[in-house]
From Swiss-Prot:
CDD domains: WD40
Gene Ontology biological process: signal transduction
Keywords: Repeat, Transducer, WD repeat
Summary of subunit composition and partner proteins: G proteins are composed of 3 units, alpha, beta and gamma.
Family, as annotated: Belongs to the WD repeat G protein beta family.
Organism: Loligo forbesii
Descriptive protein name: Guanine nucleotide-binding protein subunit beta
UniProt superkingdom: Eukaryota
Repeat (WD) residue spans along the chain: 54-84, 96-126, 142-171, 183-213, 225-255, 269-299, 311-341
Keyword Repeat on entry: yes
Function noted in UniProt: Guanine nucleotide-binding proteins (G proteins) are involved as a modulator or transducer in various transmembrane signaling systems. The beta and gamma chains are required for the GTPase activity, for replacement of GDP by GTP, and for G protein-effector interaction.
């Protein structure tokens, strides 16, 4: 039995090496070579324009609404707060049944928010009830591990990722799981929907990223390269690439059509993990939230650091860029959200 396993192990290693060689052969240029004639973006300096105060404990997640004005945040204080980013007013403060919340999401329509965490359940809240109060409109049980990330496709469909090593597509109306997406060999920490909503990418503690087709439920591609857990993942605005952030202190850029890693964003001085990543609207800048309380801004094409957003007194746990590209929000364990531009 052990000899059989060993033989199989060697065979998989050989196959992996063949794939690696094939990818190398297909890589006719590097990002650095291809962008040699591109001017660097220069120094990016952003200021804190708003500070959102109201949470009483660590903030774990935030997500902008598609109107680029409202945002939702989730904190260990057991509250989901919907904020008006222009006025800093709280539009809704939603007490949660479980305070161990790890993710939140705003529906594109603006009608719903969702959250979940160590309760293994994705809870959907309706913001537009006749009575004007916010209420749980649906609870989606089915994962056997914590909920790490959730994103709405529309008002009736949501995709979740979980510590049970799977992702899932749900019908919100019926509360049923439509598809389960397997293949990761570690906790799935993050997911990002493609701009066309037909695929999503996931990052996991097996240090790999996977691309799934939402319609047929199959893993189409697997991307390796990171040396530790992938905590965050986000699609490039055109849908042909995505970026990841990992505990190995690097962010990486993967090209879907080239089927491989094409860029790495790291610095000798940066030795802590990345909790969250987001692109600017054009995709030229990559923002990363770090355990060392900072948010680094990277020039995607030049693979150089272009700026730092410093202002939090604890780990930056989440960040997001508005759909109109005009602002970035950071959330932190210091219990504050900051809006920058």
């Amino acid at each position: 039995m052990t000899s059989e396993l060993e033989a199989l192990r060697q065979e998989t290693e050989q196959l992996k090496n063949q794939i690696r060689e094939a990818r190398k052969a297909a890589a006719d240029t590097t990002l650095a070579m291809a962008t040699a004639n591109v001017e660097p973006v220069g120094r990016i300096q952003m200021r804190t324009r708003r500070t959102l105060r109201g949470h009483l404990a660590k903030i774990y997640a935030m997500h902008w609404a598609s109107d680029s004005r409202n945002l939702v945040s989730a904190s260990q204080d057991g509250k989901l707060i919907v904020w008006d980013g222009y006025t800093t007013n709280k539009v809704h403060a939603i007490p949660l049944r479980s305070s161990w919340v790890m993710t939140c999401a705003y529906a594109p329509s603006g009608n719903y928010v969702a959250c979940g965490g160590l309760d293994n359940i994705c809870s959907i809240y309706s913001l537009k009830t006749r009575e004007g109060n916010v209420r749980v409109s649906r609870e989606l049980p089915g994962h056997t591990g914590y909920l790490s990330c959730c994103r709405f496709i529309d008002d009736n469909q949501i995709v979740t990722s979980s510590g049970d090593m799977t992702c899932a597509l749900w019908n919100i109306e019926t509360g049923n799981q439509i598809t389960s997406f397997g293949g990761h060999t570690g906790d799935v920490m993050s997911l990002s929907l493609a701009p066309d909503m037909r695929t999503f990418v996931s990052g996991a503690c097996d240090a790999s990223a996977k691309l799934f087709d939402i319609r047929d439920g199959i893993c189409k591609q697997t991307f390796t390269g990171h040396e530790s857990d992938i905590n965050a993942i986000t699609y490039f605005p055109n849908g042909f690439a995505f970026a990841t952030g990992s505990d190995d202190a690097t962010c990486r850029l993967f090209d879907i059509r080239a089927d491989q890693e094409i860029g790495m964003y790291s610095h000798d001085n940066i030795i802590c993990g990345i909790t969250s990543v987001a692109f600017s609207k054009s995709g030229r800048l990559l923002l990363g939230g770090y355990d060392d309380f900072n948010c680094n801004v990277w020039d995607v094409l030049k693979q150089e650091r272009a700026g730092v957003l410093a202002g939090h007194d604890n780990r930056v746990s989440c960040l997001g860029v508005t759909e109109d590209g005009m602002a970035v929000a950071t959330g932190s364990w210091d219990s504050f959200l900051k809006i920058w531009n």
